Amino acid sequence: MAKIEKSIIIDAPVEDVFNYVEDPGNIPEYWPSVIEIKDVEDLPNGGARMTSVYKMAGVRFDVESVCTEYVPNQRTVYESEGGVSSTATWIYEPHDGGTKATIRNEYTVELPVLRKLAESFLVKMNENEADAILANVKAKMEA
Protein backbone atom coordinates (compact mmCIF):
# COMPACT_ATOMS: atom_id res chain seq x y z
CA MET A 1 0.00 0.00 0.00
CA ALA A 2 1.32 3.42 -0.95
CA LYS A 3 0.79 6.53 1.15
CA ILE A 4 0.80 10.18 0.13
CA GLU A 5 0.34 13.20 2.38
CA LYS A 6 0.38 16.80 1.15
CA SER A 7 -0.67 20.13 2.67
CA ILE A 8 -1.27 23.67 1.45
CA ILE A 9 -2.13 27.00 3.06
CA ILE A 10 -5.27 28.61 1.61
CA ASP A 11 -6.24 32.23 2.20
CA ALA A 12 -9.89 31.42 2.91
CA PRO A 13 -11.88 30.45 6.02
CA VAL A 14 -11.88 26.79 7.07
CA GLU A 15 -15.67 26.58 6.68
CA ASP A 16 -15.52 27.78 3.06
CA VAL A 17 -12.72 25.36 2.13
CA PHE A 18 -14.45 22.46 3.89
CA ASN A 19 -17.81 23.15 2.21
CA TYR A 20 -16.21 23.40 -1.25
CA VAL A 21 -14.07 20.26 -0.98
CA GLU A 22 -16.76 18.15 0.66
CA ASP A 23 -19.45 18.93 -1.94
CA PRO A 24 -19.34 15.87 -4.24
CA GLY A 25 -20.43 17.98 -7.21
CA ASN A 26 -17.19 19.98 -6.96
CA ILE A 27 -14.79 17.01 -7.03
CA PRO A 28 -14.27 16.92 -10.83
CA GLU A 29 -13.34 20.64 -10.66
CA TYR A 30 -10.33 20.06 -8.43
CA TRP A 31 -9.42 16.34 -8.76
CA PRO A 32 -7.72 15.94 -12.17
CA SER A 33 -8.27 12.19 -12.66
CA VAL A 34 -11.96 12.28 -11.62
CA ILE A 35 -14.08 12.84 -14.71
CA GLU A 36 -17.52 12.29 -13.15
CA ILE A 37 -19.30 11.82 -9.81
CA LYS A 38 -22.53 9.83 -9.86
CA ASP A 39 -24.95 7.96 -7.60
CA VAL A 40 -24.45 10.38 -4.68
CA GLU A 41 -26.29 9.39 -1.51
CA ASP A 42 -26.25 11.55 1.61
CA LEU A 43 -25.36 9.61 4.75
CA PRO A 44 -26.61 10.15 8.32
CA ASN A 45 -23.07 11.04 9.46
CA GLY A 46 -23.09 14.13 7.19
CA GLY A 47 -20.87 12.60 4.52
CA ALA A 48 -21.85 10.80 1.34
CA ARG A 49 -21.65 7.55 -0.58
CA MET A 50 -20.78 8.03 -4.27
CA THR A 51 -19.27 6.58 -7.39
CA SER A 52 -16.27 8.42 -8.83
CA VAL A 53 -15.38 7.79 -12.45
CA TYR A 54 -11.59 8.00 -12.84
CA LYS A 55 -9.30 8.04 -15.82
CA MET A 56 -5.70 7.20 -14.94
CA ALA A 57 -2.94 6.22 -17.34
CA GLY A 58 -5.56 6.05 -20.09
CA VAL A 59 -7.73 3.56 -18.18
CA ARG A 60 -11.27 4.48 -17.12
CA PHE A 61 -12.72 2.86 -13.99
CA ASP A 62 -15.34 3.40 -11.30
CA VAL A 63 -14.53 3.69 -7.61
CA GLU A 64 -17.19 3.33 -4.92
CA SER A 65 -16.57 5.60 -1.92
CA VAL A 66 -18.27 5.94 1.45
CA CYS A 67 -17.61 8.55 4.11
CA THR A 68 -16.70 6.76 7.35
CA GLU A 69 -15.82 9.86 9.38
CA TYR A 70 -17.27 13.35 9.04
CA VAL A 71 -16.31 16.11 11.47
CA PRO A 72 -17.51 19.44 10.02
CA ASN A 73 -14.73 21.95 9.34
CA GLN A 74 -12.10 19.53 10.72
CA ARG A 75 -11.81 16.13 9.05
CA THR A 76 -13.37 13.61 6.68
CA VAL A 77 -12.37 10.06 5.85
CA TYR A 78 -13.54 8.19 2.76
CA GLU A 79 -13.02 4.46 2.19
CA SER A 80 -13.02 3.51 -1.49
CA GLU A 81 -13.02 0.31 -3.53
CA GLY A 82 -12.92 -0.35 -7.25
CA GLY A 83 -9.91 0.05 -9.50
CA VAL A 84 -8.17 1.49 -6.47
CA SER A 85 -8.74 0.62 -2.80
CA SER A 86 -7.98 3.64 -0.69
CA THR A 87 -8.50 5.58 2.48
CA ALA A 88 -8.58 9.30 1.73
CA THR A 89 -8.45 11.70 4.66
CA TRP A 90 -8.93 15.46 4.44
CA ILE A 91 -7.81 17.53 7.45
CA TYR A 92 -8.78 21.20 7.79
CA GLU A 93 -6.99 23.42 10.32
CA PRO A 94 -7.17 27.16 10.98
CA HIS A 95 -3.92 28.88 9.97
CA ASP A 96 -3.28 32.65 10.30
CA GLY A 97 -6.85 33.57 9.35
CA GLY A 98 -6.90 31.01 6.55
CA THR A 99 -6.84 27.24 6.27
CA LYS A 100 -4.19 24.55 6.26
CA ALA A 101 -5.70 21.78 4.11
CA THR A 102 -4.09 18.34 4.18
CA ILE A 103 -4.92 15.38 1.99
CA ARG A 104 -3.68 11.95 3.05
CA ASN A 105 -4.27 9.03 0.72
CA GLU A 106 -3.35 5.41 1.38
CA TYR A 107 -4.09 3.22 -1.61
CA THR A 108 -3.60 -0.07 -3.41
CA VAL A 109 -4.12 -0.34 -7.17
CA GLU A 110 -6.35 -3.31 -7.97
CA LEU A 111 -6.70 -3.11 -11.75
CA PRO A 112 -4.20 -5.49 -13.40
CA VAL A 113 -3.60 -3.06 -16.27
CA LEU A 114 -2.60 -0.30 -13.87
CA ARG A 115 -0.68 -2.66 -11.57
CA LYS A 116 1.65 -3.40 -14.47
CA LEU A 117 2.87 0.18 -14.44
CA ALA A 118 6.01 0.68 -12.44
CA GLU A 119 5.12 1.31 -8.80
CA SER A 120 7.41 4.32 -8.60
CA PHE A 121 5.65 5.83 -11.62
CA LEU A 122 2.24 5.42 -9.97
CA VAL A 123 3.45 6.88 -6.70
CA LYS A 124 4.95 9.89 -8.49
CA MET A 125 1.80 10.33 -10.59
CA ASN A 126 -0.37 10.30 -7.45
CA GLU A 127 1.96 12.68 -5.62
CA ASN A 128 1.68 15.08 -8.55
CA GLU A 129 -2.10 14.65 -8.52
CA ALA A 130 -2.25 15.46 -4.79
CA ASP A 131 -0.27 18.64 -5.47
CA ALA A 132 -2.67 19.53 -8.31
CA ILE A 133 -5.74 18.84 -6.16
CA LEU A 134 -4.52 21.18 -3.43
CA ALA A 135 -3.43 23.86 -5.93
CA ASN A 136 -6.84 23.67 -7.64
CA VAL A 137 -8.70 24.05 -4.33
CA LYS A 138 -6.44 26.97 -3.36
CA ALA A 139 -7.00 28.71 -6.72
CA LYS A 140 -10.78 28.30 -6.48
CA MET A 141 -10.99 29.48 -2.87
CA GLU A 142 -8.69 32.47 -3.36
CA ALA A 143 -10.31 33.66 -6.62
Enumerate the language-model features and the residues they cover.
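Hydrophobic-ligand-binding modules of eukaryotic lipid transfer/binding families
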Residues: 1-9, 131, 135, 143
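Hydrophobic ligand-binding cavity/cleft-lining segments
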Residues: 1-45
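Solvent-exposed residues in well-ordered beta-strands and their adjoining turns
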Residues: 9-13, 53-57, 68-70, 93-95, ...
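A generic structural signal for secondary-structure junctions
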Residues: 32, 118-122, 142
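Glycine-rich portal/gate segments that line the openings of hydrophobic small-molecule binding cavities
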Residues: 38-87, 96-100, 132-143
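Beta-strand/loop substructures that line and gate deep hydrophobic ligand-binding cavities in soluble
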Residues: 79-132
